[in-house]
Amino acid sequence: MPAIITNKFRIHNSEQFQESFSESSANVYYLAIGRPHAFGTSTRPDSRTEFEGSDTSAPTPVDSIQEEFYSFDDFMAAKKVTSNDISFSVPRRNWTTGTVYDYYRHDYGHLVTGSTSSTQSANSGATALYDATFYVLTSDFNVYKCLDNNGDANSTVEPSGTSNSILTTGDGYKWKYMYSLSAAQRQNFLSTDFMAVATNSTVSSAAVDGAVNIVKIKTAGSGGTNGSHTGVAIRGDGSSGACTVTVSGGAVTAVTVTTPGTGYTYGYIRNADIVSAGATSLSGSELDVIIEPKGGHGFNAVKELGGFFVMCNTNFEGTESSNTGDFVVGQDFRRVALLRDIKSGGSAASSTTLRGTKAILLASNSGNFTVDEEINQATSGAVGKVVEWDSSNKILYYVQTRHNDAGADSNGNLTAFSSTHTITGQSSSSTGTPSSASSTVDSISFSSGYVGSEIDADTGDVLYLENRASITRASDQTENV
């Protein structure tokens, strides 16, 4: 049986995601960064290799169980995402002069019959409203919906102003002002490809449910009496709609709505009514009454423009010193992940930030360890990868992955660092002896010299995963992710 999952279901999902931040049993989300070492071909303990792209061409993540497990191996830190960090969004479409924009229609994709039969499509070829280029972002950061493109003409006059009335520009386009991007929205939710979408309360309050403002000419007809014929009824399930039909050369050349009416979910204009209004002998005209979305244009910008995308923007400020300094600086990252309902120390994570690395407190050392070098421990055979070396506090931060030289030992096992056996850096030749004491140093509580990651491995869900070119972090730097 033919069926479809509608775009409203996609919008519903985005609404549910936003609501999940504030429900009584709210989900908890974190944005994590990871992969401090370069992408490349990795050797597995069974001597086979896995291709992981390169630093010049980051690998495309795979939606798989393996990818989710792998991602937890090298998380460096994570920061909680709040409801202020998210926004409904739509594809960004900048107004550009000389462009033919699509106009809003309620019936894209429907088979329209009459003098000709065809699937209703936009000038761009789109057969679905949300695929059509029917809204724009202007240089003033105002967003407008195109209601009429003047017969597929080039747009040459940028719309401006915030009036609730329909705006007709000098190029014949008709626009409806929807909302403006605030300074905060521009800072946090405006990218090259997407932009925030939100309903303007003033515009929403002024919207009229079921009004008709646009009528398009499908077939102009012939034989009619020239002139402007007023009082032509817009029939349908609404009331009071009326228009003026202009006939020139015997054919319909323009339709101007004079009374928008209310309550229309379908409508039509009969050729006979145009004849009765004075266009004697007109025949064959076919007019399309454009039905507005529920509530009217501007009533709900999120639904009207297709806001089934959600943007997330979280700031990482240096070490996040105000939040216990869990973020590493002087190191780079190549992976970003959105995590849901992870655990920390066996319980639901709740801290503003979480440290993703493991750490060893050294009692003594010789030389300085270097970032990204392999470290090995005598006797235990443990292997790891250095993320940060805090020489002042003698804390060695590291990760362990499931590959050779980064976590797997000579037997292919992931062995934990333990006891006071000497740790050696394979590039720097530095050595260190782990402390056997349990103490708190730099806000980190060590047990016999060791502490695990504050992100419990393989808990919760990875909802989003992105590999990217390396970004080097600095203490005076803020990343907007």
Task: Indicate where each model-derived feature is located.
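Conserved, function-critical positions that sit in or immediately flank catalytic
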Residues: 171-481
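Tryptophan-rich substrate-binding surfaces of secreted polymer-degrading and adhesive proteins
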Residues: 1-207, 286-288, 296, 341-345, ...
